């Protein structure tokens, strides 16, 4: 059994802030935990514009705090987000998140991220193998 708190993760190598400071992700469960997924708490700053494309991962996101917009860049659709909203990037959609207020979301990635990934110039996480 694994039990962790966000308090113990804060300011460790599991607590990642984007280079532009727009978002912060606390990686609660990572690939090294060997459970087949990773689980993160991500906070995105109000008024920021954030483009992502998880070409190698499926991501499920549940918004627990804040409001904003999700723009599906592949299908030219826009969605309002509020607490209780969930979106699933099961088609590896390129997307943009534009928070009106600070957004806090709980995210699940499959395959799991290892914690060493960095978004490339296209917003993509590379597929990093979990060492045996």
Swiss-Prot record:
It is an enzyme of class 4 (lyase). The keyword Lyase applies. PANTHER family: L-ECTOINE SYNTHASE, PTHR39289. GO terms for molecular function: ectoine synthase activity. It holds the Pfam family Ectoine_synth. InterPro entries: Ectoine_synth, RmlC-like_jellyroll, RmlC_Cupin_sf. It catalyses: (2S)-4-acetamido-2-aminobutanoate = L-ectoine + H2O. Keywords: Lyase. It comes from the Bacteria. GO terms for biological process: ectoine biosynthetic process. Catalyzes the circularization of gamma-N-acetyl-alpha,gamma-diaminobutyric acid (ADABA) to ectoine (1,4,5,6-tetrahydro-2-methyl-4-pyrimidine carboxylic acid), which is an excellent osmoprotectant. Pathway: Amine and polyamine biosynthesis; ectoine biosynthesis; L-ectoine from L-aspartate 4-semialdehyde: step 3/3. Its EC number is 4.2.1.108. SUPFAM superfamilies: RmlC-like cupins. This is L-ectoine synthase. Belongs to the ectoine synthase family. It comes from Rhodococcus erythropolis (strain PR4 / NBRC 100887).
